[in-house]
């Protein structure tokens, strides 16, 4: 059985046993070695380059690999097959999907102003901030030979008195740890739960000083995932962060993700990539940053496109791309954090913003709601320009929407220098109109060298080239320009 050694730039080598004829890109994915493949391995993007260091691969020159590069050992992993033992070098850019965790500066005036404006606008539209979750600290008499009331009844009586409710529900996940927590804290505890009319449903029992009740809002983009923790009592933001979507190594757009999840074991791989590799680490990081415990998250909401929603819950998404393009669900009720093994409170409801169609999902539902165009007399245009691009047009009388694939057109597609907004990407550009000298801004630490151009950089460059009359309105270079060769 052949062995393939992946020498990852800046990382430890990974050795994998395989069979003759195995596709190198598929082998790398099975070994969790990240190789950038926006087209998901169909050979059209030319981004999945690796370098053969030792041994042989069945691979041939292509339009993406010149004869000179081929002689140097460069290959496309998607079109390379294993023929025996070999060692390949994987460039660091291949792990670009593993974007470094970024935590926002919540004290910045811009962050505060945007959030406050959103809340104010929703309130004016009749959507008020409400909270049915409670954290109550109760003290109970410790049991004795003269007081043999069981723990659950002791807690129930204390909560009925503290909250003025008629009924208290203690679910299994709380009951199994109740005895330990009560005695560890001398029967002085904080109980968190949901107040539903005259019923209080316990969700967590913990130390009396742990009184935080937290909400978690998640935007699952095809390329980037952003998360916000909020205080459910005050509505204030506690922490905010973002990271790359771990699914990116299975394709840059939703079509390639759907194709990949249709392969044997594909759904589990893509669900693990978004949950275990992406969401769970962000939750742990933000809870630590905010100084709260993960079980304090009592409610979660998710905004994502239709395909991302399917892959999140592990539902087959094939019907999304097949005629007549009918998703498995628009609205999903009753989903809990424990169903997805998310490290929040196991009983936390997970609200998935409803999808509208196969390619217009809950992210647009949420964005339309937050933008307020649904409650305005003026005709407005709401644009979400990400990996998936969506547009909503209308006012309080009507709303129409459409979608397209936007990000890969800039980042992978047929732009040889295109890349995502990770280290080494040119993200902004200005051109001096007199000297025609360009100045660029590059993602990464100081001294970072340019590797390619991301979407915002390409838009900036085109804008500057046109402003300085280096290109014309048709996008063609003006040949008499002093900098044109």
Regions flagged by a language model, labelled:
Residues 1-14:
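Eukaryote-biased recognition of intrinsically disordered, low-complexity regulatory segments
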Residues 17-61, 227, 241, 282, ...:
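N-terminal cofactor/phosphate-binding cores enriched in small/glycine residues
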Residues 27-31, 36, 47-97:
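Iron-sulfur (Fe-S) cluster-binding segments and ferredoxin-like electron-carrier domains
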Residues 47, 296-306, 385-387, 478-484:
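A glycine-rich phosphate-binding loop feature that marks nucleotide/adenosyl-phosphate handling sites
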Residues 69-71, 76-217, 222, 234, ...:
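Nucleotide/phosphate-binding catalytic cleft detector across ATP-hydrolyzing
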Residues 218-222, 227-255, 319-333, 366, ...:
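Glycine-rich phosphate-binding loop of actin/hexokinase-like ATP-binding domains
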Residues 246-289, 414-415, 424-430:
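N-terminal phosphate-binding loop and adjacent alpha-helix
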Residues 461-485:
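Gly/charged contiguous loops adjacent to phosphate- or pyrophosphate-bearing nucleotide/cofactor binding elements
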């Amino acid at each position: 059985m052949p062995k393939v050694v992946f020498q990852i730039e800046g990382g430890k080598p990974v050795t994998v046993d395989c069979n003759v004829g195995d596709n190198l890109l598929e082998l790398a994915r099975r070994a969790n070695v990240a190789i950038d493949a926006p087209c998901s391995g169909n050979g059209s993007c030319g981004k999945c380059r690796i370098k053969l260091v030792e041994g042989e691969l069945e691979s041939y020159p292509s339009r993406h690999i010149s004869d000179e590069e081929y002689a140097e050992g460069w290959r496309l992993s998607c079109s390379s097959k294993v023929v025996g033992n070999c060692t390949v070098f994987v460039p660091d850019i291949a792990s670009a999907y593993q974007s470094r965790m970024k935590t926002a500066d919540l004290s910045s005036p811009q962050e505060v102003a945007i959030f406050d404006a959103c809340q104010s606008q929703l309130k004016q539209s009749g959507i008020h901030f409400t909270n049915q979750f409670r954290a109550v600290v109760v003290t109970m008499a410790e049991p004795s030979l003269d007081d043999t009331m069981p723990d659950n009844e002791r807690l129930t009586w204390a909560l009925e008195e503290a909250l003025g409710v008629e009924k208290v529900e203690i679910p299994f996940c709380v009951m199994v740890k109740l005895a330990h927590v009560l005695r560890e804290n001398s029967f002085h505890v904080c109980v968190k739960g949901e107040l539903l009319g005259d019923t209080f449903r316990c969700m967590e029992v913990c130390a009396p000083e742990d009184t935080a009740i937290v909400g978690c809002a998640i935007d699952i983009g095809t390329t980037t995932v952003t998360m916000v923790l909020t205080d459910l009592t005050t509505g204030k933001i506690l922490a905010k962060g973002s990271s790359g979507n771990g699914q990116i190594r299975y394709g840059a757009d939703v079509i390639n993700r759907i194709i990949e999840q249709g392969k044997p074991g594909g759904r589990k791989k893509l669900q693990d990539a978004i949950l275990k590799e992406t969401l769970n680490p962000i939750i742990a990081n933000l809870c630590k940053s905010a100084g709260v415990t993960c079980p304090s998250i009592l409610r979660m909401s998710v905004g994502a496109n239709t395909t991302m929603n399917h892959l999140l819950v592990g539902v087959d998404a094939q019907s999304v791309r097949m005629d007549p393009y009918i998703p498995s669900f628009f609205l999903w009720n009753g989903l809990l954090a424990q169903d997805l093994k998310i490290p929040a409170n196991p009983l936390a409801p997970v609200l998935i913003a409803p999808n509208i169609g196969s390619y217009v999902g809950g992210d647009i539902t949420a964005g339309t709601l937050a933008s307020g165009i649904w409650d305005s007399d003026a005709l407005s245009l709401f644009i979400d320009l990400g990996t998936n691009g969506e547009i909503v047009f209308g006012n309080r009388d009507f709303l129409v929407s459409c979608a397209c694939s936007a990000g890969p057109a800039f980042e992978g597609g047929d732009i040889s220098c295109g890349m995502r907004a990770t280290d080494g990407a040119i993200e902004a550009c200005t051109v001096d109109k007199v000297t025609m000298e360009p100045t660029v801004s590059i993602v990464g630490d100081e001294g970072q060298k340019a590797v390619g151009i991301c979407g915002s950089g390409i838009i900036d460059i085109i804008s500057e080239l046109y402003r300085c009359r280096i290109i014309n309105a048709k996008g063609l270079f003006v040949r008499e320009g002093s900098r044109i060769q």
